[in-house]
Regions:
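Active-site-flanking beta-strand signature of metal-NTP-handling nucleotidyl enzymes
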Residues: 10-18, 66
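Short, solvent-exposed loop/turn elements at beta->coil junctions and helix N-caps
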Residues: 53-57
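Beta-strand elements of well-folded, non-transmembrane domains
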Residues: 17-21, 73
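An amphipathic, aromatic/His-enriched active-site/gating alpha helix that lines ligand/cofactor pockets
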Residues: 34-50, 60-61, 68-108, 114
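Short, Lys/Arg-enriched N-terminal segments with co-localized hydrophobic residues
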Residues: 1-5
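Short coil/turn motifs at beta-sheet boundaries
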Residues: 8-10, 60-62
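Short, surface-exposed ligand-recognition loops at beta-strand->loop->(often short) alpha-helix junctions
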Residues: 20-31
């Protein structure tokens, strides 16, 4: 529930990407800037209701970004994974050069106030 209204979203995945250098992080940010809208357009057709790419700024001396995906059902989450895997494969050469450490979590939204 958001505020007093039910939303379409009930599942979320959150991924944190940690980079060794600022240059690696900036390259990865550029990849998302170039390709993120296209990926979301594909995911939206499969039930992804929200995509957000963020830079984590409160950890001094570290280089981190994160992604947030929200889905309208468990099936939408499953359906989106193929598109996400295809996206990952399309940038694999860049990923190997950047080599981020990825930490993933999958969440059920219990309360979301705004």
């Amino acid at each position: 529930m958001r505020g007093n209204k039910m939303t379409e979203t009930n599942l979320m995945s959150y991924n944190t990407f940690t980079f060794k250098t600022e240059a690696q992080m900036l390259l990865y940010i550029r990849l998302w800037e170039e390709k993120g809208k296209l990926l979301f357009a594909k995911l939206k057709q499969k039930g992804c209701t929200r995509f957000c790419y963020n830079q984590i700024w409160n950890k001094k001396g570290t280089y981190k970004t994160s992604t947030l995906f929200e889905y309208n059902s468990p099936q939408a989450y499953k359906d989106c994974q193929k598109a996400i895997d295809n996206f990952r494969q399309s940038i694999m050469k860049e990923l190997e050069a950047i080599s981020p450490v990825i930490e993933s979590s999958r969440n059920v939204i219990l309360q979301d106030l705004y």
